Each structure stands twice: as C-alpha cells, then as structure tokens.
C-alpha cells in the first residue's frame, strides 16, 4: 500500500511539473472557452491535488490562485426572488404564485429573478470577495408535494398536485437557467444572429430541484426520520413525477438530496435514489448537492446513526453520488481516500460535474465572453420587476367566498381595516426572502386606493393573543447607547457608537450595516440605557434575535443565549416598573454569520374590550379583517412556543383563537366582515365562512401585496386565482402527519367533503362549460404506440364583466379501484369579455394516461376506460365529463 501511495504522489508531482512548464502566454485547455465544458473540466481535474479537489466539493469553494480558479458559493436562494443578498424584488411566496396557475407568467417572473441574480453576481465579483448568497447556483425550486397542510415549509412548494407542481417547476427552471419557456437554449443576448453558432452557450444560472425525493415534514424530526415501506405507486405517481420532468424536460442543473432516511438509508447516501433512479433510469447528468448539514446527520449523536465518524459519513455520501456537500464533513475526503473508503476516481467523477457546471456558467471566462454578464445593475428591483410582482400577486389571490356580493367594495363606502396582518410589511415577504427597496402593507394599499377618505385602523388583537401592544421605548429618556466591535468578543476599541432613540429594529438586509464602519457579519454590539418610569407599570421586554444575545436587567442576567446561532424564538420577559425607580437595561448581541437581526422594544400590552373595538368600528359599511398567521409561526425548523404550532409546523389547522373570537364578535354585532387570510398553508376556517361574508386567500403576497389586495377588494382586478391545495374543515380529516402514504390525502385520495376543494376560486363574473368532445390524434412521442388526444369544449362568460377562468382537466381510470379519485392532467387560462363564448382546445398527450403498473413495476400508459372531466375546480369538473377507451 505504501508503494502504491508513493507512486500516485510521484505521478501527481510529474503532472504538476509538466503543467508548470506551460508558456505563460498560451491558454491551457481548461482556460480555452472554445472547448467543451467537459473537455475543460477533464483538463483542470488533471491539475488538481486531492486537497484542492476537496475544497472544491464544499458549498463555500475557495479560490485556488495557482490555477486561477475563482471562489464560488454554491449556496444561494431564490424561491420567490433573489434572497438574502441585499435589495431585490420580493415576489409573492411560491404557494401564492402557484395559485395563479399561470406558468407563462411564472416563467417571466423567474426570467426577472435570474436577471437580478446575474446583475448582483457582477456587483459581488467586482468587490473581489464573493460571499454566501452572491453566486449563481440557486437552490430553487422546491418541488416537494404539499401532502399535509400542517407542514410549515409547504409555502415554498407549488401545492399538493404532481402535475401542477411539474408545470410550475419547469417554468422556474427554464426562467432561471436562461432557457426558452419550453426548455430550449436561448440565443445569447446582445450577440448577432450570425455569430450565435460561434458563441459558447452559457447557462444563465444553475437551478436546483429539491428536496429529493420524498420530503414534506414534520420539521421537528427531519434529521432523524426514517420513511419505511412507502407504496411504490405513491412514490412513482405522486412524489417523483416533478423531479423526473425537471431532469428530463427542464435539464435542471442540480438536485438536492433531503435530510431524512428512506428504508434505512439517508437520502444523501441512498444509492437507490441517487444512482439507480436519478442517474441510471432518468439519465441525470448534473450535480447532486446535500442539504445543509445532511451528511453530518449520518454520524451526529442522536441522529441517523448510519456512520460513526465524519470520514465514514463522507465515504457513504460520495460513494452514493452526492457530489457537493453543504456542511463540513467533506473536509475528511483525503482521510477517506487514504483509508481506502473512497476511490479517488469517485472524487473525480463528482468534482467533474461541479466543474462542468461552473464552466457552463462562464465562471472561468472573461466577462466579454459571457453575454449574461452584460445585464445592467439597474435591473435590480426595477419598476418593471415590481410591476411583475404586483401582476402575479393579483393573479394568485383566491376569492373563497362572496356572500351577498359584498365584494367588490367601492370608494364611497366607509371602511375600517382591522387585524394583526394589516400593517405588517415583514409578513408580506414569507420565508427565504430578499429585502425590498419598498413595500406596501395591505392597510397602506387600501388607504392608497381610497385617497381622500379616512380609513381607520384597529389592530384588535395580535396573531395569537387577545391583546394589542404599544411601545414604551420612550422611557429611555436619553435613548440607548449602542456600541459596536468588529469581532464577536466585544474586545478592543469599538468601531462605532450610536444613540438609539426609538425601538431597535436592525438587520443586515440589503447589505445594510448596523452603523457606519460595522461589519455586515462577524461583529458584536452592546445596547445600554436607563428606564425612568413616571408611574407604576407592568411591561414586557421583547426581542427578536439572529444570532446570540444576553439580556441584563439591573445587573441580573435574565437571558443568556450568546452561543445561539440563527434565528431564535422571540424573547418576551416581564418587567415591573415602579414610579421614580430607574432600571438599567443592557443587551449584548453577537453576530456569527449570514443574517443579522437585532430587535428590541419595551411594550405595554393591553386587552381591548369588545365594546372598545366596536366603538372604533362605528357605523362602517364593512370591516376588512386582515389576519391569518405569519412566517414567524410557520417555516423551516422554528422554535415556537404558541398553541397550535410546533417546530415550524402546525398541530391544528384552525385560525388562532384570538382572531376567531374577534371575527365572531363583529358578526354577532351585525358588522359586514371581509376576511383577508394571509398564510402559507390551508386554514380550516369553518366558523369564518359563517361569520365573514367575503373571504380572500392572500397568502404572503410579496412587496406589492398591498396594492394587489386593494385592487381585488375594490374590483379593479377580477380575481382569477385557484387553490393549489385542498382546504380541509378540520385537522381531524387528516391521517397521521408521519404517514407518507397518500390514502385519504389531497384531492386525489380524500374521500371526505373539503371546505374548499383543490382548484377552487371564485370570480366577480361566472362561467359556463359546454359538453366536451375528445379527438384522437397522432402521438408526438417518438415510438409511442399510444395515441394523443385533443379535448375541445365551449366556455362562456355568463356574467356582466370581463374575467379569466382556469379550465382544469382531470382523468380517472374506471377499473382502478385503488387509484386516485381523479388526477389533474391539463389546465388552461382563458380570458373572456362579458357574454363572450370561446371554443377551447387542450392537448392530452398519451403520458396523461400513464400510471404505475404493479405487474411490470414501471410507469406506463395503462389501457382501460377513462373518464375525462373538465371544469373550474376539482369538484366542479365532475359535472362535465366524457369517457374514452385508451389502448
């Protein structure tokens, strides 16, 4: 063995020596942009040491100066706009955009997102120090199936249906990677047509399909969960179709493996999924990245326990096919190779995929060669992109109820706005968001629309409590002194000082420093002041922190979380003040990396009575109650201490009790209520359907959400959104959250009566479907023995105003007793003027009739008698159907 190692070392030295003799003015093969990405990657691989290869397989890949390799950050986010990288256009959350059922518009959105991404990458490149979230690999889209509304990260997905998820996911990938809407390479911008063939076809950005393969909560146990015995039919018909299509039709550059185990093997070391399915069956040529810390889960005490050490975990992941690690375990690659646990050829295979991706981006080439680098900086958060954010926000708002035609409202009415989400700009962004240059809350959107008319705002309650809060920060008569150090230990001379006169609400969003001269990350701060009360008061100290903090009151340490990393649960501590008795407050803050947040206030909490609330409402014609939940309550692995929430997920589906009580009280008092629900998931709002005359599902609508909601409320925009998930009546309608089988889940298998069905959404007009006809046409799929079909039907706007309907096509195989009740296979947005009738044609390719064949263990076109349904929702579609025999 020693002789073998010595021989490899000598060969490596000879290769490096030969390369070193290359003339300085001659391009090396890997530096030549006219060669293929594969040829360049092969050449560069031959020049790298094992230690250098290891560094390049980490998510934060450092520069290797001797070979001119620039630094690269693989971890970047763009679920609904460029995230965590300064100012950017903040589009509505993914679920909101899915509700538009408009993949063509979604493609425009992600073309805009990739424009901003390219412009931002150039800014970072010119700075000479590319940080996390500033490169061109984006871990987007999330094409997991939102199988259970309790999952806190469902807001990142495109809903519960495989077909809708696939259509929307493809639009995202094509927009991000600079491909045409149907997945073909686009002509290089700014390059004459005559020169296109001579120009390397660079990828605009790298998209990533995540989380492969069966992943949708719970958040609290994702690092230990083992999914066992999932039926093959559920796997292939529900959980895998979107991934397969994004690989084969969208040519997605990356796939991210998930945290959990499947049948005992962690997803990031699961050879069945990574090697057999992804690479061998689907032909995936791109790279596989781990989720962050997923490989560490193999060996960390109390987690998966499939490895004893980081070296062993690394060997398992690399050998299975995980090319890139977000984490720290891959630092042990040299030890694993030395121990014979990994063959270096495996390392080379993985690294080649990473290098090919970077060469396709133009990461090694001069800017003048890469046309995407010419996208100007002024596209970032430009007006056109903000208008696009408003457009898709309008299309994704779903009108769930409009009893007695309360909507649309008009400017002449007296409107009172109420509720905890009405004036919350942070809620608009959802999770994994960027930082808008400006945003409009729903309250402000309504006020803007009713200029010249007073619009009163009554908070009435918080999201989860029957109380309202008032800042008492002014009791710091001299403010709070702020001191900053560019280290995490508060050592040495401060780099800045300041005096905080109002509640502290600081973040490094938009690359904003806490004070001039302070680092964006890796710094510390101290805020200190004296409260001077003029009366006895019971208050609370409220803090929102990302990363570590310590709270000291009159010398006593009340909170000590200095070692915390990441967003911590809101800190709320009681504070009793006595008139004339000063209280000294000190807050120490430690910023470790990435996001910095420091929020601090002294709050007076009061509980308004029903009489006080009604007095504020007065004789209003309508109360617009803007409630729901927020990204602080649902999201990725959150520390939450509120009834109904656990670890970022929900334990029930109901609207929080405090809001429910206010809406019921308003109804009992005879007030006409419009309930605007903001959430990333379905809410079981049975009482609200009785106590509110109108209900809008507004999700988390992005930076221009206030304008979009106002336009729908007042009728300037006719709502056309359709639900991408089922709204259930109760959590009791659902199977166990840990059960991944599809039995009684989603509209495809749920046998109960939903509150609002999948695909549902009202309009201010009405539509009527004619009897459909089905025509057999020659299959477009080469070599297919099955036929394609064309479905035709009339659609008429039977109302008094223009509107857009999303016509939905579902199928069911009649003899499939264990199969779906129905499955979405096509949809089309159709805009019609009042009274207009149009013949609508929708293609149903032969793959629409594909399903799992248990006899052959394959997905194939299954012969039989099928019912084909068409309508405005999964429920309405049952009214208009036709049968067809598929051979």
Show which residues each predicted segment covers.
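Bacterial Sec-dependent N-terminal signal peptides
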Residues: 1-26
